[in-house]
């Protein structure tokens, strides 16, 4: 079971569904990381469509660039399916993810201070 497995969701290691008293609650990892000092870019993306894959790739590139530029730490969380574990076709799994996971784990940038870091470097070239 992943940290993001939803309550009641069945997995191969949790065949009766995630129960909070037994397995704990799902973790909003990106929201937690966004509050940490030193993070500059925290985002949640998905891979359910070509457009979503392109956004995820751009987010990964941006995270690497932020690291190269010395802006701080980045975290890119990728929501994806587990077709075989969910016993669904890929299309069914994508639909299930859109209908169930996106409500709990909304996609998009949660923290982005990379532009601020870039502006600071331009104002003080020694950074």
What are these regions (language model features)?
Residues 1-126:
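Glycine-rich ThDP/TPP pyrophosphate-binding loop and its adjacent helix/strand module
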